[in-house]
Amino acid sequence: MKKLASFLALLLFVATACDNEKVVDETKLPVNAQDYIEAHFPNARISQVVRDRDDLETSYDVILDNQVKLEFDKKGDCYSIESRRTEKLPDTVIPLKVLEYVQEHYPDAFITDWEKDKTDQEIRLSDSKELVFNLAGTFLRIDD
């Protein structure tokens, strides 16, 4: 009986662990995420959506057919965008103050990645520099 209980507990653990990441249909994306993609990447199609459940958090990883990867929280708010190093992100996805700083200080470069967390936001430029800004868009430092 003990072995059966242990086996069932292990089976339950494995089953729930396997459900952490799951490929889902794009209709399962929050409406805000669908609207965001349509507004900022109108010529791209969604190739894959992966729902990630970790503890009490749910997020969505979206890969577009142009190889751009976006990450959304459970409400559909975008917090990360990655492109190929040769691809410029649309200006509309970058906060205006960050975009203006880059245009003024790095006129020959463009933004390829953007990520926001609870305390700051970080971008990667086409020349591989990584710049860190606070949430209001004020430049803080170059990240090595």
Locate predicted features.
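A short, surface-exposed beta-strand/turn
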Residues: 69-83, 130-143
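Post-signal-peptide N-terminal segment of Sec-exported extracytoplasmic proteins
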Residues: 31, 35-75, 79-80
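Intrinsically disordered, low-complexity Ser/Thr-rich linker and spacer segments
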Residues: 80-92
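C-terminal motif of bacterial Sec signal peptides marking the signal peptidase cleavage site
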Residues: 14-17
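Conserved histidines in hydrophobic membrane contexts and catalytic metal-binding motifs
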Residues: 60-62, 121-130
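Short, non-transmembrane alpha-helical segments in secretory-pathway proteins
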Residues: 25-46, 89-110
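Sec-dependent signal peptide recognition
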Residues: 2-9
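Residue-level detector of conserved, function-critical positions
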Residues: 112-117
